Each structure stands twice: as structure tokens, then as C-alpha cells.
Amino acid sequence: MSALNTYIVTFNCAREKVDPKVFACHLLDALPKPQAPDVLILSLQEVAPIAYAFLGGSYLTPYFDRFRHAVEVAATAIPNGSQYTNIITRNVGMTAIMAFIPNDQANRIKWLETGGVGVGVQQMGNKGAVGLRMGYSYEDEVIELAAVAAHLAPMENGLERRNEDWKNIVRGLVFTPVNENAVRTATKLRASHRNTGEDEPLLPGSPDNFTIPTSGLYTPTSHLILAGDLNYRTSRSKPSPVDYRLYPQPTKDVTDPRHYSNLLKEDQLSSELRAGRTCHGLREASIRFAPTYKYSDKQQAVAETNDGSTWDWAKHRFPSWCDRILYLDLPLWMKTEDPPASIRVNNYTSLPLMSTSDHRPVALSLSLPTTAIPTPTEAAADSDVRINPPFTINPQWRQRRATARRKEIVVGLLAFLVLTWEGRTLILAMIVGASGGWFIMMSILAT
């Protein structure tokens, strides 16, 4: 094992159940060669209707099971590939993350942490982020890897709101251990990797940090991958009635005004990254694929049979690269100590459109070093975003998430009663029961 091969897919599910067989056919298309990845991460947005997503639990099981089945089917197509274990699945509202490890490598996961934050209405999870951090052992090293699934504010004119959402994610997404019984062991394992004294809290104001260690998005010894529908567009305003005539079409001629590279110049995320206003410290591989959003209903209807000779876009939205995957490069102190170490991008591309969504999935294949990121030197204190993050952790992060979760349950119950067939059936049964009881009571009184 010369590298930790990591494969990430982000997909906006449009609140529909994915077709496992179709998803499986293309899930691993971005692998540079038919070799099973060591870590497989799925970042899912709008994973289910709001009622099921906010209530969570068993209501989401049918949606997650389809992705588990898709991974199982896709893995069988890899020569000498093993089956995968879903080591963790978490959601915050409508945004979810799933992590898979080959069965024969599952014992390499030494600890797991998860965290999440809502950035939607009243900090609820109609928009937000959910993440995991794992300790992956290789020989005598423990490699820390964090992956975050995110869904930011929509619309062409929502640029500032998207940047604000990112700020709130950095301030509010805090990782805590999954298994409380393993907390003490995990804390000891990580102590040698963290630039923190035994008595110094990892976060200000957190309770007994030896038994409940916590960490923010940026951590000195951890890799970080961000994947999701970040919703950055190619215009600040909606298109005019004639703009669609120059929407991208399949062509290799870069001088053609309809070649996607011309629209890519207007990409908001690229300009905001350069200006240092969002996704601080993260980088992205070169984009060599068409916009991933928004495809028309007509294009979706023929998604599984289309020959790709044309792209049919929704005319009321500028085609945009909403779905993105970014990563944090190795810190300078690691490059200095271990010059050959590097993060290698094997492939970054979009996957075929599917009939259940107006977004195309996006996949990234990365090879990470099998040596852990060392504890930074004192001289590196301000040289990396891992040590000097753009925003501080909100000391009220736990209370805010708990309050938002209570609101999600209320909204989920109301949506369940009004928007789902189960809820409407329940209301009808209650009405029929109440009416029947009223008539029985009136009959008794009449006699």
C-alpha cells in the first residue's frame, strides 16, 4: 500500500430515492484504474423529502439502503475487489454523509468522530453540513482524515449568503467521538498528534475534554475534504429570455462561444477562492467537465438513454458548477520534513446525469500519503489554516444545534402530516374516527 486511495462522490438527490442499479453503473467511473479505493465517501444533499429528513431515523433507512446496495453492486465490478462496510452514516436534516471501507480493512479504523451544523432557516438542516473524521491506521501511523458534506444557499443572487453559510459551518461544525466507550483510548491515540497540552481544552468552554474530546473543522494533523452542492453560480442575476441560446453544448472547439470553458470564467466559487472569501485554504483540481446544474426535465427523462450529443438546460437558470469537491493540501511543515510526500489527484470529473435529479454527480479520486501529518513546529504557528483558521468556534455551538434540532422535529412532524401520504392518511383516520365518535355520542344522547 503506497497511498491511501480515497474516492469521493457528491450528489444532490433532489429528494428522490436513487435507482441503485443506475447509480452503481457509474459510481466508480472516475477511478483511474479498476482498483478498489481504500476509503469511499458519499456526500448527499436533499437526500429525502423534508419530512423524512427532519424526522430522521427509520424514515431515512430506505434512502440510505439504496446507496448501500449501489456500493455493493459497484464493488462487484472491480477485479479482485472486496465488498465494503458502511462504517458510518450521518445526516443533519437533508444533508448526509456515508463512509465505506473494504471489509478486510475495517479494522484499520481506530476511531471515528462526527459533527454537523444547520445553516438554513433558523439554523435548521434544510441547508447545512455534516462531517466525519476518522483515524486510519497503516503500519505504525494513524492518518487523520476529515470529510464534510455541505449544501449552501441557492439562487444566483445568494453569493454573500453562501459565503456566510461557509463561515457558520466553520464556526458551528464541531467533531465529537461516535463511540463514548472508546473516547479515552482515542484521546490518548490523538494526544501525540495534537499540538495541545494535556490540561489545555481543545475548544474553549467544552466540558471535560479528556472524556469528551472535540475538534473543529481545521485541525493541525488532519486531512480535510469538502464535497457538496456548494451552489456557487456563474451569474449574480437570472438569465434573460434569450441567454439560453449561448448555454454550453458538447464541442471540443474552445473558440466556440458555447464551449463550457467560456462560462467557467464566470464561476463564482473560483473567484471567491482567489479572493479568500470562502473555503479558506482549500484547493480544487482543474475543472474539465460541463456544468453540473440545472438540467431540464426533458434531459432528465432521457438521462439513461441519451447519447450525449446535446445538453438541454433549464432556461430559467444559468448552467453552473454547483457540485464541487475541494481538499486541503499538505501543510508546509510536512512538506519540509518529508519532501516526497504529496496529495495526488488521480481524476476529477462529473458522472452521467440520472433521471431522478437535475444535478450531475461529481467524483474525485485522491491518493493521500500513508504517513501521518506530523505535529507542527512552533515556527509554523501562523503559516497554515489548520492552525490559524479563518473563524473561531462558536462557544454556543452545542446549544444552537440542540435548539435547531428541536425545531427540525416540529417542522418534520408538520410536514409529515401535510406532505406525506402516511400523514394525510393519519389525519383522515383521525377525522373519520372523531366523526364516528361524535355520531355515536349524539345517538346515545338522543336515546
List where the protein language model places each region:
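Conserved beta strand-loop-helix elements of the APE1-like EEP
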Residues: 92-112, 132-137, 152, 317-335, ...
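Catalytic metal-binding/acid-base residues of hydrolase active sites
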Residues: 14, 47-48, 151-153, 230-233
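Eukaryotic intrinsically disordered and solvent-exposed regulatory patches
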Residues: 26-29, 82-87, 116-120, 128-132, ...
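Acidic, polar low-complexity intrinsically disordered regions
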Residues: 35-36, 52-53, 57-97, 101-129, ...
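N-terminal, active-site-proximal structural segment of metallo-dependent hydrolase catalytic domains
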Residues: 1-87, 94-98, 158-161, 166, ...
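Core residues of folded domains in eukaryotic genome-function proteins
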Residues: 4-9, 36-40, 94-96, 126-132, ...
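Catalytic lobes of large eukaryotic enzymes
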Residues: 71-82, 148, 161-410
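PP2C/PPM-type serine/threonine phosphatase catalytic core
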Residues: 99-101, 107-174, 226
